[in-house]
Amino acid sequence: MIFPDKFDVIVIGGGHAGTEACLAAARMGCKTLLLSHNIETLGQMSCNPAIGGIGKSHLVKEIDALGGAMAKATDKGGIQFRVLNNRKGPAVRATRAQADRVLYKAAVREILENQPNLTIFQQAADDLVVEGETVRGVVTQMGVTFLAPTVVLTAGTFLGGRIHIGLENHSGGRAGDPPSIALADRLRELPLRVDRLKTGTPPRIDARSVNFDGLDEQWGDKPTPVMSFLGSQDDHPRQTCCWVTHTNERTHDIIRSGFDRSPMFTGVIEGVGPRYCPSIEDKVNRFADKNSHQIFIEPEGLTTHELYPNGISTSLPFDIQLALVRSIKGFENAHIVRPGYAIEYDFFNPQDLQYSLETKVISGLFFAGQINGTTGYEEAGAQGLLAGANAALKAQGKEPWCPERDQAYMGVLVDDLITMGTREPYRMFTSRAEYRLLLREDNADLRLTEKGRELGLVDDIRWAAFCEKREQIEQETQRMRSTWVQANSAEALQLADKLTAPLNREYSLLDLLKRPELTYADLGHLKGEAVANVQVAEQVEITAKYAGYIDRQQDEIARLRQHENTPIPASFDYDSVEGLSNELKQKLNEARPDNIARASRIPGITPAAISLLVIYLKKRGMLRKVAAES
C-alpha cells in the first residue's frame, strides 16, 4: 500500500546519524519521517559507552551549536566527564564523557518524541522508489510505500552486515539485530561504488567478577565539564570512576595461539578495520615489540554490572577470548557477559557524493554515517545533521550548505571524504584540520550558531542564549581594552607575584591578559566586576592570548580565498590540460573537484599541477564564463 501521508524528508535508520538527520529536517519545518527497524534502539550506543574525545568533541560541539541532540543527550547521560589535553593549547583540548547507555538512549528518545514535524515508524526499509535518476520514496519490509522527494540513508553497519566470532559467522546488523540484506542488494544495483569495511567490539565483563584491588582509578574532572553550550552540571546524573589495567606477555601468547582461528588472519574477513581503533589481535601482531597494552575499564551505566574493557576489541574464538581476559590483572576470575565480535558491512565510496552529501547519480538520495566510510558516533552525527539539513533545503527548493574547512570540523570531515575518499574507517582528529586554532571546541557556537539560525536549525531559546553570550564577550573585551593599570599602582602590586617582570609603564587589562603568566581570573576583578559566565571569560582570554596566531591563520585563509573563488566547470575536461601526467588526470577525473582549492587538496596534486589548471582556465576564458553563469 501507499501510505496516505506524504513527507518532505524520509530518514532510514535511527542511530546517531539518523537521529540528527531527522531532527535537523524537522527543525527546519519539513514534514519528516524516521524509519527504524526497532524503536527501542533509537540512539543506541552500539560500541563504546562514550561521547567525545580528541577531534570528536569538536564535532559534538558543532552539532550542538546547530541545535542538534548529541551534546544534550550526553549531559543527561554522562557519568564521567574529563577534558583531554587540558595542559595543551585550546585548539586541541577535547571534552570526553563516559555515558550510561540507558540514560543516553532515553534522552535521545525523549528529544525525538517531542520534536514537532517528526513522525516515527517502526519498519525496516527494503527498497527505494527510484524513477529515472530521482528518488521518490521508500518501501518497507511489509510492503508499505512512503513517498518523499528526499531520502537520507543512515544504515550504519546493517547493510549486508556479517558478524564474526572466530571462524564462525552469521548475518547481523549488530549483536541481536538483523541486517539489511534486501536494501543492501537494492543499493548494489545503483551506479555507486561499493566495498566492505570492518569494525569490532570487545567482550563485556561482569563487574562482580572483577578484582579492583590494585587497579588504577580514573575519576572525572572537578568542576565537572558540560558538553552542551546550554548544559549545566545539574543535568548530570551521579558521577562514577573508570579503572586502568594492562595486557601482559601471557595475554599476548594466548592471543597469538588463536591466530590460526582468527577471521582476520585467515582471510575470512575481507573488510578493512579502523586504523586508530585496532583489535587486540591486530595490535599484538603489528606491535610485536610491545609487551603490554593499556585497557580502560569503563562502566556501561549506573544500573548495570556490565563493564566495557576499552582496548581489547576482538573477533577471536570465544575460548581464546575467555583465556586472554582471565590473563589480565583484575580479570583473573572475570565472567564474560557478551563475547566480543567483528562486523563486516557495505560502505559506498564517498567520492560519489556532492558536498551536500547527496549522491551524484540519484537526485534526492543522501548518505550519512558509516555508509560513507566513517567510524564513530560523532562523525556519524555530524554527517547526519548536514544530510538532514540539506535534504530539507532540497525539499524546500533552496541551495545546499556545507561549511568550509576553515569554518568547522564538519567541513573538514566532508571535504576529506569527498576529495580523498577512504579505504579504511575514517576517524576525526584535530591534526586533520589545518585551521584548528580557529576551530576550537569552545567557539563552535560563535562559528556556527548564526548560520544555524539562518537555516532554521536553531530555536529561540538557543538563539537568545547565544546572542546574550556574544554581547557579553564584546562588552567584556571592550571593558578590558579600556581599563588601564599604571606601573607602581595598587593593582600592579597585586599582580607582582605573578609577573615575570614588574610593570614599567601603563598597560590595559587586555594587553596584560596576553601575557602567558596571567589569566582572566587574575585580571577580571582587578578594576571593576568580572563576568560570571565562564564561557564568556574563556573566550575573552583565548582571543587575547592567541590574537597574533589567529590573525595569521585568518590572513592565510584570505590568501587561499583567491583559490576558493576559482571554480572549475562541472564539464571540465582534465585530459585536455597539457603538462598534467596521466596519474594526475585520473585523480582529478575521479574526484571532480568544483574549485581550485579542493583540487589542491587531492593527494598527489602538486602546486605545479594547480598552476597548470589555473593557466588553462584563464586561457580558455572559463573563469569569466563560470562567474557569469553563477
UniProtKB/Swiss-Prot annotation:
Cofactor(s) needed: FAD
Keyword Flavoprotein included in the entry's annotation: yes
GO biological process, one term: tRNA wobble uridine modification
Chief site of localization: cytoplasm
Alphabetized GO MF terms: flavin adenine dinucleotide binding
Localization in the cell: Cytoplasm
GO cellular component: cytosol
Cell division among keywords: no
Keywords: Cytoplasm, FAD, Flavoprotein, NAD, tRNA processing
Cited InterPro entries: FAD/NAD-bd_sf, GIDA_C_N, MnmG, MnmG-rel, MnmG-rel_CS, MnmG_C, MnmG_C_subdom, MnmG_C_subdom_sf
Binding-site positions, NAD(+): 273-287
Domain of life: Bacteria
Residues holding FAD: 13-18
Family under the similarity heading: Belongs to the MnmG family.
Oligomeric and partner information: Homodimer. Heterotetramer of two MnmE and two MnmG subunits.
Function per UniProt: NAD-binding protein involved in the addition of a carboxymethylaminomethyl (cmnm) group at the wobble position (U34) of certain tRNAs, forming tRNA-cmnm(5)s(2)U34.
Protein name per the record: tRNA uridine 5-carboxymethylaminomethyl modification enzyme MnmG
